[in-house]
Amino acid sequence: MPDTNKKSLGITRRNFLAGASAFGVVAGLGTLAACSPSSQSKGSEDSSASTSASGGDQRWVPESIDKVYDTDLLIVGCGGSGIACAVQSAQNGTDFIVIEKGTMVGGNANFVEGIFAIDSTPQKEAGIEIEPADVVMAELERGQYRPNGALWMDLCEKSAENIDWLLDMGCLFSGVIDDYHGGLFQTFHWWKDGKAGVGYVEPMKAKMDELGIEPHLETAAVSLIMDDGAVVGVYAEGPEGVIQYNAKAVVLATGGFGGSPELLEKQGWNTESLHIVGSSNAAGDAYKMCMEVGAKDSLPYASQSVLGFIEALPVVSMEDAANPINGYWGIASGGPVLWVNEYTDRFNSENLRDISMVMPFHAMKDNAENYCIFDQAIFDKYFGLSDADVEVFKKSLEENLGNSLYQADSIEELAEKFDLDAKTLAATVERYNKMCEKGEDTDYGKAAEFLEPIAQGPFYIAKIGYSFFFTTGGIWTNKRREVLDESKKTIPGLYAIGNDGSMLYRNVYTINMPGTAFGNQVNSGREAANNARAYIQG
């Protein structure tokens, strides 16, 4: 049996600590930051913290300051939600600055395919009618009634107006509205070319230019500045050196923690074989800063957009997502294969992907190791559908990156490849084959169409890792997008939006309600802009 106490990571950890010595600290640098000063925001050079931050209870204080900016609102992060917050803030006439950790705006939003809405103008034109209650109750049921239904109702009620607003901003849609590969309702509004980078980010960037919004790029927030329990700014590091942003309110929009192996591991995921599809800049910077000032931790309840990953196989491209070898419904996703864990137990139905694409990998989370087993007949019928597919698999088997894919002439030999118990694995396969022969899965109710016996060699075994697209949640917030402390009281002046502060889901990202994650990006960004404006105005 494999060592279940392994802690090594299968990828190189990104170094987010460059320049941290200027702060007299080493841990926690970063924040997927976001955009630019408005024409009213002021910048000055200074060698010490300004009086607006002095006397506070901030945990980290830089030894020296190279630049000071004063503004009413600071938006930290210029991805999907940060962009919406910035544009809405500009329309509100708010004096603000937006900073961005990366070299360009958009972040993970560039790869999003569509957005949720009900009762939108395009849906009305297409004759699509969906009741808000149907959406809300379906989501609450899938979340075991743990999410706050008022948050879902808020998203539903504002979604149509958000689509109208996006159209007014110049955003581009393909015109297709569907259920996104078998979701529950036709709520998915596809961006032009199926990419938010084309339909959302570029048009919104043009709108930002029109409004005079200039992001402070390559600027990473390090810590929050506190004064008498309220957030009054951020310390950051960027091209201008160590920067102090004084603000009356701060909105965090750093993209979640999907780019942080450490936080994924803390949440219980095995990160030994890990592929980060989304931006590595989404490294939990907002989460870390909020925890430092006493925010309530919702990391145990945060959700993920996660698929399977076999290291030996090529990384799937968005343009080839349906590839039968390594695509979204490929070998790692389940279907006709057999799943076993480190104890050689079959632990669930292998066609959970019929519920949602992410569900199989939540079923695997509690295991130390996960493997899929199949034979040549299964490969030929389901995976090797073309000469190109066969060649890709053959090459992957020969190169065997990560020692994750093997062929053998017997089940017992397969077990040896991963130091599994040969006797119990053979017994598991035998039991499974008997159910396949009867055409009924009496253990987990797997669909009969996928009950294929593993009987004809050669046999194959692959170790399944995880491919992370993004995470959503981690910071406890309320309907106004305000960050809450351990007593569920607001931390004045602090907001978290998008994937940082989402409270829509509990542990499982219910992708079968198509487009809700990005719907929340836009909705929470606009709401935070409006609520922060009201807070600033008193």
Predicted features and spans:
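Bacterial lipoprotein signal-peptidase II cleavage site
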Residues: L32-E45
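An anion/pyrophosphate-binding glycine-rich loop and adjacent beta-alpha core
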Residues: Y287-L420
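Conserved beta-strand-loop-beta-strand element in the redox core of flavoprotein oxidoreductases
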Residues: I225-I243
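Glycine-rich loop(s) and the adjacent beta-strand/alpha-helix scaffold that form part
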Residues: G238, Y245, A249-L313, N512-P514, ...
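Conserved N-terminal/central alpha/beta ligand/cofactor-binding core
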Residues: K6, G19, A53, W60-P62, ...
